[in-house]
Amino acid sequence: MLNQVSVLIVEDEPFIALDLATAVEEARGKVIGPAGSVREARMLIEQHLVQAAVLDVNLSDRDVTPIAELLIKDGVPVIFYSGLALPVALRERYPSASAYTKPTPPVELLNKLVALMLK
């Protein structure tokens, strides 16, 4: 399904991050991360070619907005994945953003990522 696409996972809950990483690998994608903070995510973005991303909204150090802005500016398909609804500020800034609440099955997220990459 993913054919070696590099997917950045930004998620601070270890079990959820593991589920996402496993799903990416099973779909024949390459996992970048997971990153549990904005700082970690920035380092990974500097070190790797990110072709798609699944972003938790609230991380251990702050919200994911700086990472989302960086990736979206570069045309990287992004899915927000949060325990809560997407914050108003992010929804207003990115009205067409794909946002899912936990516990959406990882395969559903990956199907949406593939659809976004084909646009």
Model-predicted regions and their roles:
Residues 56:
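Active-site residues of response regulator receiver
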Residues 60:
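The feature encodes the CheY-like receiver
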Residues 66, 73, 84-102, 107-111:
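Alpha4 helix (beta4-alpha4-beta5 surface) of REC/receiver domains from two-component response regulators
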Residues 11:
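Conserved acidic carboxylate
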Residues 79-81:
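Hydrophobic/aromatic residues positioned on beta-strands within the core alpha/beta folds
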Residues 14-33:
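Two-component/phosphorelay signaling modules centered on CheY-like receiver
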Residues 1-6, 39, 91, 101-119:
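Non-catalytic signal-transmission and effector/linker regions of two-component phosphorelay proteins
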Residues 34-52:
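Acidic, metal-coordinating helix/loop segments flanking the phosphotransfer/catalytic sites
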